[in-house]
């Protein structure tokens, strides 16, 4: 019971609600954790409290903790491990805590898919799957689906008298392809798999269309649409009532009042009918008759008021007319005929989906593979059993898990789907009032509905649970935000109190949902939130809508670039919490958030033009990259050289290097036949003298092509790719171009993709090319390879979805004027979890099609869900900001938009009217009307408070609201007047005019001599490695060293060498592993393999480097005395960079300059450990020792000491200077032979 829970300790930093979430027990608990409320810390503390509970401790492996991502699971484990280690410091003798640390790696702290995998691995014998199954990648899954579906449709086309199938084809395919039918089958398959019982859900789709013996009132679609009818009639009535108020003004058109009152009565009649039945509304709609307005002399009244009255009345009439046309132009029974007619066709469609699912599952089973939805359904199959009445009950295995888990904790619960919810239900106790399920999330941040997440699960429990937990589950609100300044939180609250409600938005943004200040910040300057609305330029855009979008992106990018540059240049300050002080803002403190990434390239370009470093992880553009495009054409030619366009592209590319004239010459040798045939014929003959160079180029390429084609038939695709890179030299070539590193990274990604493809059950170049073509046909793409680290000092551009869980000092939210993406609502067919299937009624014989009731209902439902999702996306965007929030949107006609937005000022309630919120087409349609009711918009509007209540008008938030003229952003910067004369002289190539008083200064500069000429022959900045080389006699001079750095002519690139990695590359790989190996985990082969695989995924290692790592040598180090000291040390620092000033004569043996000269030395220390008696420095070496020295290690030791003595002495000196502590020991560790060398002075 509540009174038995531990009291919050004195001086605790936990809030009361946080503490309640940490200690509450005895029932299912739902924690609604607002953005920045410290939910992860609460979750970890709850787990720790359970583990170290004195009265009833729980082993960590008796907890199931479900996270949304693998990264979150790992972070959770790390935090729990750190917390347990702190407990161990206070209780060093606690065997229980030591046991928990050893159990932590085996604990069930993972994603739901990892838990499902664990269950399946344990009980695979209950399923018809190979226990050696593997997880299919997306590539393989798509290819399998395509193959299965092609086979099924081919069979159906071959069946005689397959009448219903061909009717389905006639209705839902074009005369060119059956792609739409394929899309329908795949979409139904995917949607069905988001339900615990897919077949049951599919059967319900068909049942809904069986309307025999039913009336329209029995249909769920009609019931839902009646609610929408009431909503629209209410909107119309509000327009009329507002018009009536205006007509009653002293200068209003009073003669209109009588007509308006009749309008209210008419709408009241329609609303009453809507509360009765569909048939009643239909009949009432047939009798709608609007009275004619009485003529008035407009000069007798305020003309603007008359226009407003007439406009509002027309809006009301339009609402009714829309209902009449969409819903009530047809008799109710005609809608029923649509359903009856479509029923057999839908039945056939569902049958095809079931056959597809069965065949697809069988093919995966034969190939020993499963996908992620299989993991969920297989797990559910193990944990459930079906009763006689068809209900799903927990199986014996589920009951075992219920007994095992003392508590199940689910993070990001708002993103759970129906199948995952069922799995969780089967491993937790039945009763919510006595349950052991702890759920944490924020439904306001549920933004993954497109991945079939179901926020309704969270909302249902939030409404059902109480804060006291009486008679059911308990809910706890964590509303305090420890991330952001007051200005960010108050600004966000002000907007969402007005736009987010249950009817429109699915969530009541009430006092419990509001963000509350939890963080403390010093006073800051210019911290008010901002809305910058850009008025688009009036110039005609020649490229239509696409051109207008580009211009909007450019305008917003220029405005953001100006603001970022101004803030950085002016030293705008942000708070550094680590140092508890203000500091100048850096580029990495800025983020630009977008709903989607199409604008990102334009924004990047504009920022770069302003000299602002910027990075965006683009998910497009990979196949458009020139180097990738050329290589894909090479592979197309290898697969089939008879393709003219790919072959011409390769011949024209830098690989072969033909000019346009040479290409034309080749074509002239044979006007008929393919390019390949012409090339073959040309090479058989003797070339003319002027064609010898062309002949040589083509002969070189032709011979290579024949070799590649032969190689492709016998060897792997990935080996073919490296062979092409090597024999063409193209990989090296692109490395020398601008952005060479990026280009080479793109080519490496192509190789990696090929390796991943070959890891599937598919093989061969043809299938690989076909798959890539399917990707391009679908409009998909991959992002270019990442060539930038996450800690770089750059402005980041990312989607709002990618930003979830992150925070930034300064946040720009751009593109707020872009329309919501409603393409899904325009599809030929619609699917919904509750309403099933909806499409137009299509009659191919009569060649007619029209909207059906199911389509209208699903479209309306999806529109309202889209509106709710977009609200949540906006909430996520606004809550990423820590200190400064800047909102930017562009509109075509600011005055027109403002007139629309000003309607909100007439409403006195906090929540804006439903029709304003539901009618929004972009984020600005919510933000601007909200802010126009605040006093800070008065500088722009100059309208006064009017009828806006004080609590809204004077709400405690600070905003800057501004309309920016787009012309000022696109105007070129004015050239300074004093530069005009200079520019004119440069244009005409005349002598530059020089003022007489500056002639002497110019002369002095030209004749000046450097006073430290001796220092010019030695570099002022050296690495420790370079200094070490200077001390080796054979390389004592800089000139010799520089000579050594020069690359020999025609150096063979690595991918051409048979021997694989160089010694230096192997050493780099080993150092990377030693830097990242997790010292908190047991050092075993399995753990190291897992960590190395993770480094490959993060692009910290390549596949080749990973394969070269000798794991047993890494383990040998940690088994050595020195390695054990590392594991037991008080602290361990790895890859420690340093810079220090050093007297020049200490670095250069041949120094002849001034004695006071210094140089800057830089280096990286491999490992530094702090023990009780001091600091030990360790440098890892991968030099070859064994077999290189006849006298063995004893002979090698003095040579190695001499070779590395200077290096380690400099490392030690750097550490002693920075730490103010002596280094007690300097060690070299050689992996070859497991040798340790101590360096003595």
Swiss-Prot record:
The keyword Cell division does not apply. Keywords: ATP-binding, DNA damage, DNA repair, DNA-binding, Exonuclease, Helicase, Hydrolase, Isomerase, Nuclease, Nucleotide-binding. This is ATP-dependent helicase/nuclease subunit A. SUPFAM superfamilies: P-loop containing nucleoside triphosphate hydrolases, Restriction endonuclease-like. GO terms for cellular component: cytosol; DNA helicase complex. The heterodimer acts as both an ATP-dependent DNA helicase and an ATP-dependent, dual-direction single-stranded exonuclease. Recognizes the chi site generating a DNA molecule suitable for the initiation of homologous recombination. The AddA nuclease domain is required for chi fragment generation; this subunit has the helicase and 3' -> 5' nuclease activities. Its cofactor is Mg(2+). It catalyses: Couples ATP hydrolysis with the unwinding of duplex DNA by translocating in the 3'-5' direction; ATP + H2O = ADP + phosphate + H(+). Residues 505-805 form the UvrD-like helicase C-terminal domain. It comes from Bacillus cereus (strain ATCC 14579 / DSM 31 / CCUG 7414 / JCM 2152 / NBRC 15305 / NCIMB 9373 / NCTC 2599 / NRRL B-3711). The gene is addA. One of its GO terms (biological process) is double-strand break repair via homologous recombination. ATP binds at residues 33-40.
């Amino acid at each position: 019971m509540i009174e038995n829970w531990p009291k919050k300790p004195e001086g605790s930093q936990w809030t009361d609600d946080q503490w309640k979430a940490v200690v509450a027990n005895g029932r299912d608990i739902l924690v609604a954790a607002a953005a920045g409320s410290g939910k992860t810390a609460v979750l970890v503390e709850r787990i720790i409290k359970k583990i170290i509970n004195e009265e009833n401790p729980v082993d960590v492996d008796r907890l199931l903790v479900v996270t949304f991502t693998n990264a979150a699971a790992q972070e959770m484990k790390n935090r729990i491990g750190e917390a347990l280690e702190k407990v161990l410091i206070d209780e060093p003798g606690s065997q229980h805590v030591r046991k928990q640390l050893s159990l932590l790696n085996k604990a069930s702290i993972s994603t739901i898919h990892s838990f499902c995998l664990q269950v399946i691995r344990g009980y695979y014998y209950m399923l018809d799957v190979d226990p050696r199954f593997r997880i299919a990648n997306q590539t393989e899954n798509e290819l399998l689906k395509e193959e299965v579906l092609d086979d099924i449709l081919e069979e159906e086309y071959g069946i005689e008298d397959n009448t219903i199938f061909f009717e389905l084809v006639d209705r839902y395919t074009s005369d060119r392809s059956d792609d739409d039918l394929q899309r329908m089958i795949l979409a139904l398959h995917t949607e069905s798999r988001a339900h615990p019982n897919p077949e049951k859900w599919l059967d319900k789709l068909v049942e809904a269309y069986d309307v025999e013996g039913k009336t329209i009132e029995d249909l769920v679609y009609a019931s839902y649409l009646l609610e929408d009818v009431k909503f629209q009639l209410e909107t119309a009535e509000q327009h009329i009532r507002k018009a009536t108020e205006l007509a009653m003004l002293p200068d209003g058109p009073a003669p209109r009042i009588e007509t308006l009152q009749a309008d209210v009565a008419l709408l009241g009649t329609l609303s009453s009918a809507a509360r009765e039945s569909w048939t009643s509304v239909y009949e009432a709609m047939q009798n709608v008759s609007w009275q004619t307005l009485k003529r008035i002399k407009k000069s007798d009244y305020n003309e603007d008021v008359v226009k407003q009255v007439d406009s509002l009345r027309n809006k009301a009439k339009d609402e009714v007319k829309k209902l009449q046309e969409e819903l009530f132009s047809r008799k109710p029974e005609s809608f029923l005929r649509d359903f009856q007619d479509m029923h057999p066709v839908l039945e056939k469609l569902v049958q095809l989906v079931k056959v597809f699912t069965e065949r697809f599952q069988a093919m995966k089973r034969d190939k020993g593979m499963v996908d992620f939805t299989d993991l969920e359904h297989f797990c559910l199959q193990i944990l459930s059993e079906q009763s006689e009445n068809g209900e799903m009950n927990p199986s014996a295995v589920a009951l075992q898990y219920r007994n095992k888990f003392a508590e199940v904790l689910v993070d990001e619960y708002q993103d759970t789907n129906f199948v995952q919810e069922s799995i969780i239900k089967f491993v937790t106790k039945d009763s919510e009032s006595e349950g052991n399920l702890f759920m944490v999330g924020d439904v306001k941040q549920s933004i993954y509905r497109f991945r079939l997440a179901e926020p309704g699960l969270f909302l249902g429990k939030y409404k059902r649970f109480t804060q006291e937990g009486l008679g059911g589950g308990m809910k706890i609100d964590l509303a305090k935000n420890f991330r952001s300044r007051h200005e960010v939180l108050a600004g966000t609250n002000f907007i969402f109190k007005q736009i987010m409600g249950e009817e429109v938005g699915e969530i009541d943004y009430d006092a419990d949902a509001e963000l509350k200040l939890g963080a403390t910040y010093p006073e800051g300057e210019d911290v008010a939130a901002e809305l910058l609305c850009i008025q688009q330029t009036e110039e005609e855009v020649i490229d239509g809508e696409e051109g207008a979008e580009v211009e909007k992106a450019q305008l917003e990018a220029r405005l953001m670039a100006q603001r970022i540059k101004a803030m950085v240049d002016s030293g705008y300050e942000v708070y550094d919490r680590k140092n508890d002080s203000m500091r100048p803002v850096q580029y990495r403190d800025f983020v630009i958030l977008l709903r989607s990434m199409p604008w990102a390239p334009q924004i990047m370009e504009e920022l770069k033009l302003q000299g602002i470093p910027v990075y965006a992880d683009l998910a497009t553009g990979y196949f458009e990259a020139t180097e990738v495009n050329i290589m894909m054409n090479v592979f197309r030619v290898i697969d089939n050289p008879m393709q003219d366009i790919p072959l011409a592209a390769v011949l024209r590319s830098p690989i072969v290097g033909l000019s346009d004239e040479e290409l034309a010459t080749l074509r002239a040798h044979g006007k008929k036949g393919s390019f390949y045939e012409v090339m073959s014929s040309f090479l058989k003959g003797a070339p003319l003298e002027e064609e010898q160079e062309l002949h040589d180029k083509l002969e070189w390429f032709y011979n290579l092509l024949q070799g590649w084609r032969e190689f492709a038939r016998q060897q792997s695709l990935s080996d073919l790719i490296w062979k092409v890179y090597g024999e063409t030299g193209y990989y090296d070539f692109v490395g020398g171009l601008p952005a060479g590193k990026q280009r080479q990274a793109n080519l490496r990604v192509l190789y990696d993709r090929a390796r991943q493809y070959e890891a599937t059950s598919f093989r061969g170049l043809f299938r690989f090319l076909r798959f890539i073509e399917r990707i391009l046909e679908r409009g998909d793409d991959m992002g270019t390879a990442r060539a930038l680290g996450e800690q770089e000092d750059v402005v980041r551009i990312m989607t709002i979805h990618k930003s979830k869980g992150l925070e930034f000092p300064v946040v720009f939210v751009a593109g707020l004027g872009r329309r919501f993406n409603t393409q899904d609502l325009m599809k030929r067919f619609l699917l919904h979890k509750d309403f099933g299937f909806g499409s137009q009624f299509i009659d191919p014989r009569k060649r007619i099609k029209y909207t059906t009731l199911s389509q209208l209902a699903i479209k309306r439902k999806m529109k309202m869900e889209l509106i709710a999702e977009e609200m949540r996306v906006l909430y996520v965007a606004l809550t990423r900001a820590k200190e400064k929030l800047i909102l930017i949107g562009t509109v075509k006609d600011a005055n027109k938009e403002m007139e629309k937005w000003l309607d909100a000022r007439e409403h006195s309630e906090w929540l804006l009217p439903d029709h304003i919120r539901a009618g929004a087409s972009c984020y600005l349609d919510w933000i601007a009307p909200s802010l126009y009711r605040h006093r800070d918009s008065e500088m722009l509007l100059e309208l006064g408070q009017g009828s806006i209540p004080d609590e809204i008008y004077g709400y405690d938030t600070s905003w800057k609201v501004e309309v920016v003229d787009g012309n000022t952003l696109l105007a070129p910067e004015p050239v300074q007047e004093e530069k005009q004369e200079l520019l004119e002289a440069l244009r005409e190539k005349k002598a530059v005019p020089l003022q007489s008083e500056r002639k002497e200064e110019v002369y002095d500069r030209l004749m000046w001599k450097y006073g430290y000429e001796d220092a010019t022959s030695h570099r002022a900045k050296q690495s420790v490695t370079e200094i070490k080389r200077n001390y080796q006699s054979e390389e004592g001079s800089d000139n010799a060293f520089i000579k050594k750095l020069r690359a020999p002519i025609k150096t063979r690139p690595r991918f051409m060498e048979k021997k694989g990695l160089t010694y230096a590359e192997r050493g780099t790989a080993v150092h990377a592993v030693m830097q990242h190996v997790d010292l908190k985990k047991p050092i075993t082969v399995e753990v190291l393999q897992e960590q190395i695989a993770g480094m490959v995924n993060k692009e910290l290692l390549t596949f080749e480097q990973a394969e070269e790592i000798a794991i047993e040598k890494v383990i040998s180090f940690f088994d050595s005395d020195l390695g054990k000291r590392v594991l037991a040390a008080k602290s361990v620092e790895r890859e420690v960079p340093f810079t220090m000033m050093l007297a020049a004569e200490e670095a250069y043996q041949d120094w002849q300059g001034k004695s006071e000269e210094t140089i800057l030395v830089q280096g990286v220390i491999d490992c530094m450990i702090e023990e009780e008696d001091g600091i030990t420095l360790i440098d890892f070496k991968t030099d070859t020792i064994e077999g290189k020295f006849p006298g063995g290690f004893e002979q090698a030791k003095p040579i190695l000491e001499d070779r590395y003595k200077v290096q380690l002495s400099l490392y030690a000196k750097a550490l002693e200077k920075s730490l103010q502590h002596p280094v007690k020991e300097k060690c070299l560790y050689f992996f070859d032979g497991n040798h340790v060398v101590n360096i003595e002075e």
